[in-house]
Amino acid sequence: MTSQPVSQGTTPRFALLIVFLTVFIDLLGFGIVLPVMPRQAEPYLSALEVSEVAAGGIIGVLFSVFSLMQFIFSPIWGRLSDRFGRKPLLILSLLGSVVFYALYGYAVSLPFEQAQLALGLMLFSRIGAGIAGASVGTAAAVIADCTTPERRARGMALIGIAFGAGFTLGPLIAYFGLALFNERPWGVGALASLLSLVALLLAVFVFRETRVPGRTAAKEFFSMSRTVSVLRMPAVGGLILIYFLAIFSFANFEATLARFTRAAFGMADDDNFLVFAAIGAVLVVAGGLYRPLAKRYSEVSLMTAGLVQMIVGLGGLAMVSWLLFQ
């Protein structure tokens, strides 16, 4: 199947809409799995008689490995999409999400006597889902294809809105479906896999290729010398470092929030689902505000403001921990 590039006019907007829906539906599955995962991992950890500290570390790894794989593979997906087109890579990554979320559902349905296998498959599925989830990089490339440099930042805000919307509705679905997921733990992975399948069908049958034909990528797939030279550019290397630290901080926040609220305030899992949903709602609002704010303020100013708010928010959580547990 040969895809045609988008043309000028309304078609780029349609491409952006499809990318938005694709990212949103895929991240909706991520949002369903995220708050439920500690609850599903803990019985297997208890069956192995793992200490509380070690259990917290293992759950942290299950969370953080997803973001780590996204960070590593996002530029790889982007590079591959430059060579082979956006659509094939988007399809491949969404197919990976379908498979690895289904594998997660199988892992959490295993009996407690197979705790080691279950945890191993959970880890493997999170690694695979993280690699597949790096499709956000391909989505960003699509936005770059369809927008002018002046409007590119506003276009990229669509990814933030899609992420926030998925992060809001996913935990809410988990909240209202908790009783069902307790009886059928495989349902979490199955639902996430089904949602990714819907996104995959959108990518296969609705999305049109946006990479301009004739724009050839470099023959080398990877060049260490070129990578090092690019990273030495302050504008590039500095941004990548900032991005890594921000994502690393947020991933650790995601991994520890549920255990922190349980220890500090005795909050139940379903209460934490609502907390995650509230975080997602804030992400949606922030993404929506970015577009009008980008007209008045520079990208550097907005990035700085966002980082300052992250410092204040995460620092506030650290202060709460210190006050409660000193």
Language model region names:
Residues 2-12, 208-241, 264:
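Juxtamembrane intracellular "pre-TM" segments in multi-pass secondary transporters
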Residues 83-94, 295-308:
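Cytoplasmic membrane-interface "Motif A"-like loop-to-helix N-cap segments
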Residues 119, 123-162:
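Cytoplasmic helix-loop-helix junction between adjacent transmembrane helices
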